[in-house]
């Protein structure tokens, strides 16, 4: 049962400076209207990494870099191997909270390989994230 799995990971979410005040006020929101979005290769979700160099790519060109260190409820993740390609694993349209729950999963874990250097951790419900620390690097 996915509801009983309390598996969490302490992960990194990189964001652009203009987004930080909205995040502090409202938390991370999937597809906010007022934010700069950096892509959705694995569907519309909240993306994290265990690697700062991966998250650094989402901080933009400002000299200051902002990382959120978050407790992320991964529960029982579905596993996807490498870069997204049509016909491989679940489809992008299935990469959402309701579909993953229907097949017994809470999140998506993308394993490195097939050209992907770093793993990615994606949740599709904003209540699965909780900011523990904010790292602001100058």
Feature map (PLM): residue ranges:
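ADP-ribose/NAD+-binding catalytic cleft of ART/PARP-like enzymes
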Residues: 1-42, 65
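Conserved beta-strand elements of beta-rich interaction domains across eukaryotes
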Residues: 16-19, 47, 52-55, 73-77
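A short acidic (Asp/Glu
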Residues: 23, 58-59
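Glycine-centered small-residue hotspots that permit tight backbone geometry or close packing
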Residues: 43-46, 104
């Amino acid at each position: 049962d996915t509801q009983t799995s309390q598996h969490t990971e302490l992960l990194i979410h990189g964001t652009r400076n203009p987004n930080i005040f909205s995040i502090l006020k409202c938390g991370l929101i999937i597809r906010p209207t007022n934010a700069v979005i950096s892509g959705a290769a694995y569907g519309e979700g909240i993306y994290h990494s265990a690697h700062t160099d991966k998250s650094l790519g989402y901080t933009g060109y400002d000299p200051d870099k902002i990382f959120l260190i978050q407790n992320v409820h991964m529960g029982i993740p579905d596993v996807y191997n490498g870069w997204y390609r049509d016909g491989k694993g679940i489809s992008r349209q299935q990469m959402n909270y309701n579909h993953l729950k229907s097949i017994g999963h809470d999140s998506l874990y993308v394993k490195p390989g097939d050209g992907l250097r770093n793993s990615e951790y994606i949740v599709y419900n904003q209540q699965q994230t909780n900011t523990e620390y904010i790292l602001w690097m100058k």
